A protein has these predicted regions:
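Class I SAM-dependent methyltransferase Rossmann-like catalytic core
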Residues: 31-58, 62
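S-adenosyl-L-methionine
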Residues: 103-129
Protein backbone atom coordinates (compact mmCIF):
# COMPACT_ATOMS: atom_id res chain seq x y z
CA UNK A 1 0.00 0.00 0.00
CA UNK A 2 1.52 3.36 -0.98
CA UNK A 3 1.93 6.23 1.46
CA UNK A 4 -1.02 8.20 0.12
CA UNK A 5 -3.44 5.31 0.75
CA UNK A 6 -1.86 4.69 4.15
CA UNK A 7 -2.46 8.30 5.14
CA UNK A 8 -6.03 8.13 3.86
CA UNK A 9 -6.74 4.91 5.77
CA UNK A 10 -5.17 6.31 8.92
CA UNK A 11 -7.23 9.49 8.63
CA UNK A 12 -10.42 7.49 8.12
CA UNK A 13 -9.74 5.35 11.19
CA UNK A 14 -8.88 8.40 13.27
CA UNK A 15 -12.09 10.14 12.22
CA UNK A 16 -14.15 7.04 13.03
CA UNK A 17 -12.52 6.85 16.46
CA UNK A 18 -13.22 10.54 17.04
CA UNK A 19 -16.86 10.07 16.06
CA UNK A 20 -17.21 7.16 18.48
CA UNK A 21 -15.69 9.12 21.37
CA UNK A 22 -17.78 12.18 20.54
CA UNK A 23 -21.00 10.14 20.40
CA UNK A 24 -20.21 8.53 23.75
CA UNK A 25 -19.57 11.94 25.31
CA UNK A 26 -22.79 13.30 23.78
CA UNK A 27 -24.79 10.42 25.28
CA UNK A 28 -23.11 10.83 28.68
CA UNK A 29 -23.91 14.56 28.67
CA UNK A 30 -27.56 13.79 27.87
CA UNK A 31 -27.73 11.30 30.75
CA UNK A 32 -26.16 13.73 33.21
CA UNK A 33 -28.54 16.48 32.08
CA UNK A 34 -31.55 14.18 32.48
CA UNK A 35 -30.60 13.27 36.05
CA UNK A 36 -29.93 16.92 36.92
CA UNK A 37 -33.21 18.14 35.39
CA UNK A 38 -36.22 19.24 37.39
CA UNK A 39 -37.83 15.97 38.47
CA UNK A 40 -40.25 14.77 41.12
CA UNK A 41 -38.85 14.90 44.68
CA UNK A 42 -39.55 11.20 45.23
CA UNK A 43 -37.56 10.33 42.12
CA UNK A 44 -34.57 12.27 43.37
CA UNK A 45 -34.74 10.45 46.70
CA UNK A 46 -34.44 7.14 44.85
CA UNK A 47 -31.37 8.12 42.83
CA UNK A 48 -28.90 7.10 45.55
CA UNK A 49 -29.93 3.44 45.60
CA UNK A 50 -31.03 3.10 41.96
CA UNK A 51 -27.81 4.57 40.48
CA UNK A 52 -29.49 5.72 37.25
CA UNK A 53 -26.33 7.18 35.70
CA UNK A 54 -24.60 3.82 35.80
CA UNK A 55 -27.65 1.94 34.51
CA UNK A 56 -28.35 4.33 31.64
CA UNK A 57 -24.72 4.47 30.54
CA UNK A 58 -24.62 0.69 30.52
CA UNK A 59 -27.77 0.71 28.36
CA UNK A 60 -25.88 2.95 25.90
CA UNK A 61 -28.99 5.06 25.43
CA UNK A 62 -28.55 8.30 23.51
CA UNK A 63 -30.52 11.17 21.96
CA UNK A 64 -32.69 9.98 19.09
CA UNK A 65 -33.15 6.44 20.39
CA UNK A 66 -36.52 4.71 20.60
CA UNK A 67 -36.79 2.88 23.92
CA UNK A 68 -39.28 0.63 25.73
CA UNK A 69 -39.47 0.72 29.53
CA UNK A 70 -40.80 -2.76 30.36
CA UNK A 71 -43.27 -2.88 33.29
CA UNK A 72 -42.44 0.76 33.94
CA UNK A 73 -44.61 1.02 37.04
CA UNK A 74 -44.83 4.69 38.11
CA UNK A 75 -42.26 5.65 35.48
CA UNK A 76 -39.07 6.57 37.34
CA UNK A 77 -36.93 5.38 34.45
CA UNK A 78 -39.48 6.37 31.80
CA UNK A 79 -38.97 10.02 32.69
CA UNK A 80 -35.18 9.78 32.62
CA UNK A 81 -35.27 7.94 29.30
CA UNK A 82 -37.62 10.55 27.86
CA UNK A 83 -35.21 13.31 28.77
CA UNK A 84 -32.17 11.45 27.44
CA UNK A 85 -33.60 10.53 24.02
CA UNK A 86 -35.03 14.01 23.50
CA UNK A 87 -37.45 15.26 20.84
CA UNK A 88 -36.00 13.08 18.08
CA UNK A 89 -36.43 9.92 20.17
CA UNK A 90 -39.37 8.26 21.90
CA UNK A 91 -40.21 6.16 24.95
CA UNK A 92 -42.85 3.44 25.22
CA UNK A 93 -44.09 3.25 28.83
CA UNK A 94 -45.23 -0.36 28.83
CA UNK A 95 -47.38 -2.03 31.50
CA UNK A 96 -49.75 -4.97 31.58
CA UNK A 97 -53.12 -4.73 33.32
CA UNK A 98 -51.81 -5.44 36.83
CA UNK A 99 -48.95 -2.97 36.60
CA UNK A 100 -51.20 -0.37 35.01
CA UNK A 101 -53.75 -0.64 37.81
CA UNK A 102 -51.05 -0.18 40.43
CA UNK A 103 -49.30 2.73 38.70
CA UNK A 104 -52.13 4.46 36.82
CA UNK A 105 -52.57 7.53 39.03
CA UNK A 106 -48.83 8.11 39.47
CA UNK A 107 -48.33 7.92 35.72
CA UNK A 108 -51.14 10.42 35.16
CA UNK A 109 -49.36 12.80 37.51
CA UNK A 110 -46.02 12.22 35.80
CA UNK A 111 -47.42 12.83 32.32
CA UNK A 112 -49.73 15.74 33.16
CA UNK A 113 -49.55 18.77 30.90
CA UNK A 114 -47.53 16.83 28.32
CA UNK A 115 -44.45 16.90 30.56
CA UNK A 116 -42.95 14.05 28.57
CA UNK A 117 -44.17 14.79 25.06
CA UNK A 118 -42.05 12.06 23.47
CA UNK A 119 -43.41 9.30 25.74
CA UNK A 120 -46.56 7.26 25.28
CA UNK A 121 -48.28 4.70 27.47
CA UNK A 122 -48.87 1.21 26.14
CA UNK A 123 -51.06 -1.16 28.14
CA UNK A 124 -51.35 -4.68 26.75
CA UNK A 125 -51.09 -8.35 27.77
CA UNK A 126 -47.45 -9.32 28.29
CA UNK A 127 -47.55 -12.19 25.80
CA UNK A 128 -49.05 -10.03 23.04
CA UNK A 129 -47.33 -6.64 23.17
CA UNK A 130 -48.21 -4.86 19.90
CA UNK A 131 -44.87 -3.58 18.63
CA UNK A 132 -43.74 -2.87 15.08
CA UNK A 133 -40.77 -4.91 13.84
CA UNK A 134 -37.41 -3.11 13.95
CA UNK A 135 -38.91 -0.12 15.79
CA UNK A 136 -36.82 -0.07 18.99
CA UNK A 137 -33.19 0.69 19.77
CA UNK A 138 -33.23 -0.21 23.46
CA UNK A 139 -35.34 -2.08 26.04
CA UNK A 140 -34.97 -1.72 29.81
CA UNK A 141 -36.15 -4.13 32.55
CA UNK A 142 -35.54 -2.81 36.07
CA UNK A 143 -36.35 -5.21 38.93
CA UNK A 144 -39.22 -6.70 36.94
CA UNK A 145 -37.87 -9.57 34.83
CA UNK A 146 -38.63 -12.00 37.67
CA UNK A 147 -42.28 -10.97 37.38
CA UNK A 148 -42.55 -12.89 34.12
CA UNK A 149 -42.41 -15.94 36.42
CA UNK A 150 -44.48 -14.42 39.24
CA UNK A 151 -47.80 -16.14 39.92
CA UNK A 152 -50.51 -13.66 40.99
CA UNK A 153 -52.84 -14.81 43.75
CA UNK A 154 -55.59 -17.06 42.44
CA UNK A 155 -53.95 -17.50 39.03
CA UNK A 156 -53.01 -21.00 37.83
CA UNK A 157 -50.26 -19.59 35.60
CA UNK A 158 -47.33 -17.17 35.94
CA UNK A 159 -47.76 -13.60 34.75
CA UNK A 160 -46.27 -14.24 31.31
CA UNK A 161 -44.47 -16.67 29.04
CA UNK A 162 -40.87 -15.44 29.08
CA UNK A 163 -40.07 -16.82 25.62
CA UNK A 164 -43.10 -15.20 24.02
CA UNK A 165 -42.20 -11.87 25.59
CA UNK A 166 -38.55 -12.03 24.56
CA UNK A 167 -39.29 -13.14 21.01
CA UNK A 168 -41.65 -10.20 20.56
CA UNK A 169 -38.99 -7.85 21.87
CA UNK A 170 -36.42 -9.49 19.60
CA UNK A 171 -38.65 -8.78 16.60
CA UNK A 172 -39.27 -5.19 17.72
CA UNK A 173 -35.58 -4.38 18.19
CA UNK A 174 -33.48 -3.09 15.33
CA UNK A 175 -30.43 -5.17 14.34
CA UNK A 176 -27.87 -4.82 17.12
CA UNK A 177 -30.47 -3.40 19.51
CA UNK A 178 -29.78 -3.77 23.22
CA UNK A 179 -31.70 -4.97 26.27
CA UNK A 180 -30.54 -4.30 29.82
CA UNK A 181 -31.95 -6.32 32.71
CA UNK A 182 -31.56 -5.27 36.35
CA UNK A 183 -32.92 -7.66 38.96
CA UNK A 184 -32.59 -9.09 42.46
CA UNK A 185 -30.33 -12.15 42.63
CA UNK A 186 -31.68 -15.53 43.72
CA UNK A 187 -29.72 -18.67 44.51
CA UNK A 188 -29.23 -21.15 41.70
CA UNK A 189 -32.79 -22.28 41.00
CA UNK A 190 -34.10 -25.37 39.17
CA UNK A 191 -36.65 -24.55 36.48
CA UNK A 192 -39.42 -26.20 38.46
CA UNK A 193 -38.76 -23.80 41.36
CA UNK A 194 -38.68 -20.54 39.37
CA UNK A 195 -42.33 -19.65 39.91
CA UNK A 196 -42.13 -20.28 43.65
CA UNK A 197 -38.97 -18.19 44.05
CA UNK A 198 -40.27 -15.33 41.91
CA UNK A 199 -43.62 -15.31 43.72
CA UNK A 200 -42.35 -15.60 47.29
CA UNK A 201 -38.99 -13.81 47.12
CA UNK A 202 -39.31 -11.59 44.00
CA UNK A 203 -35.86 -12.75 42.87
CA UNK A 204 -34.45 -14.68 39.94
CA UNK A 205 -31.40 -16.82 39.24
CA UNK A 206 -29.15 -14.83 36.85
CA UNK A 207 -28.24 -18.01 34.96
CA UNK A 208 -31.91 -18.43 34.04
CA UNK A 209 -32.02 -14.93 32.58
CA UNK A 210 -28.97 -15.64 30.42
CA UNK A 211 -30.48 -18.91 29.22
CA UNK A 212 -33.83 -17.26 28.42
CA UNK A 213 -32.22 -14.56 26.29
CA UNK A 214 -29.95 -17.00 24.50
CA UNK A 215 -32.92 -19.17 23.57
CA UNK A 216 -34.79 -16.11 22.25
CA UNK A 217 -31.98 -15.09 19.88
CA UNK A 218 -29.90 -12.66 21.93
CA UNK A 219 -26.19 -12.70 22.71
CA UNK A 220 -24.78 -11.78 26.11
CA UNK A 221 -23.06 -8.39 25.78
CA UNK A 222 -21.69 -7.75 29.26
CA UNK A 223 -22.51 -7.04 32.88
CA UNK A 224 -22.11 -4.23 35.40
CA UNK A 225 -21.40 -4.56 39.12
CA UNK A 226 -22.87 -1.14 39.96
CA UNK A 227 -25.67 -2.63 42.08
CA UNK A 228 -23.87 -5.56 43.69
CA UNK A 229 -24.20 -5.62 47.50
CA UNK A 230 -22.46 -7.88 50.00
CA UNK A 231 -24.49 -9.29 52.85
CA UNK A 232 -27.74 -9.89 50.98
CA UNK A 233 -29.71 -12.92 52.15
CA UNK A 234 -30.94 -14.64 48.99
CA UNK A 235 -33.44 -16.68 51.01
CA UNK A 236 -35.62 -13.72 52.04
CA UNK A 237 -38.02 -11.53 50.11
CA UNK A 238 -36.62 -8.33 48.65
CA UNK A 239 -39.30 -6.50 50.66
CA UNK A 240 -37.92 -7.78 53.96
CA UNK A 241 -36.74 -4.70 55.93
CA UNK A 242 -33.37 -6.36 56.54
CA UNK A 243 -32.48 -6.17 52.82
CA UNK A 244 -34.95 -3.73 51.25
CA UNK A 245 -33.14 -1.38 48.87
CA UNK A 246 -29.89 -3.14 49.71
CA UNK A 247 -30.33 -6.33 47.72
CA UNK A 248 -27.58 -7.82 45.59
CA UNK A 249 -28.57 -7.11 41.98
CA UNK A 250 -27.16 -8.14 38.61
CA UNK A 251 -27.14 -5.84 35.59
CA UNK A 252 -26.93 -7.76 32.31
CA UNK A 253 -26.82 -6.52 28.74
CA UNK A 254 -28.01 -8.50 25.72
CA UNK A 255 -27.73 -7.72 22.02
CA UNK A 256 -30.09 -8.86 19.28
CA UNK A 257 -28.33 -11.41 17.10
Amino acid sequence: MNSRYCRRATSTLAFAAWLFVASQAFAADAIDAAIASERMPLDRQEDAWRKPAEVLRFLEVAPGHHVLDFYSGPGYYSELLSRVVGPTGSVVIYNNELYNQAAHHELLQRLRGKRLANAKRLNAPSNYIPLEPNSLDRVLFVQVYHDLYWQPGGSPEPLADAQRVLRRLHSALKPGGLVVVVDHIAKETPREELIRVATRLHRIDPHVVKADFDEAGFEFAGESSALRHDGDDYSVSVFNPSVRRRTDQFIYKFRKR
